[in-house]
Amino acid sequence: MALTKAEMSEYLFEKLGLSKRDAKELVELFFEEVRRALENGEQVKLSGFGNFDLRDKNQRPGRNPKTGEDIPITARRVVTFRPGQKLKSRVENASPKES
């Protein structure tokens, strides 16, 4: 199961007593600010959680799996996430949930 923005909003509504509208707006504003920073080429550092970085990938050769034809994979910029030490430690020490 995945955590959704709707579930985050619901959690803020329940725990902080925000209205549902304010909770949803807070979640949207948070992600919009992360998105804006990355679009502007900035690193996003969330203390105790991790860092979102941008990485430029060079053009490289590829192959069409259907035809076997050689095709170039264009250069692009990708977002990477590196978890912080606190997050890594908590995940490693968490007991697995049954699905």
UniProtKB/Swiss-Prot annotation:
Protein keywords: DNA recombination, DNA-binding, Transcription, Transcription regulation, Translation regulation
GO MF entries: DNA binding; structural constituent of chromatin
Record keyword Manganese present: no
Cited InterPro entries: Hist_DNA-bd, Histone-like_DNA-bd_CS, IHF-like_DNA-bd_dom_sf, IHF_alpha
GO terms under cellular component: cytosol
Its job: This protein is one of the two subunits of integration host factor, a specific DNA-binding protein that functions in genetic recombination as well as in transcriptional and translational control.
Subunit structure of this chain's protein: Heterodimer of an alpha and a beta chain.
Family: Belongs to the bacterial histone-like protein family.
Protein name: Integration host factor subunit alpha
Native organism: Dickeya dadantii (strain 3937) (Erwinia chrysanthemi (strain 3937))
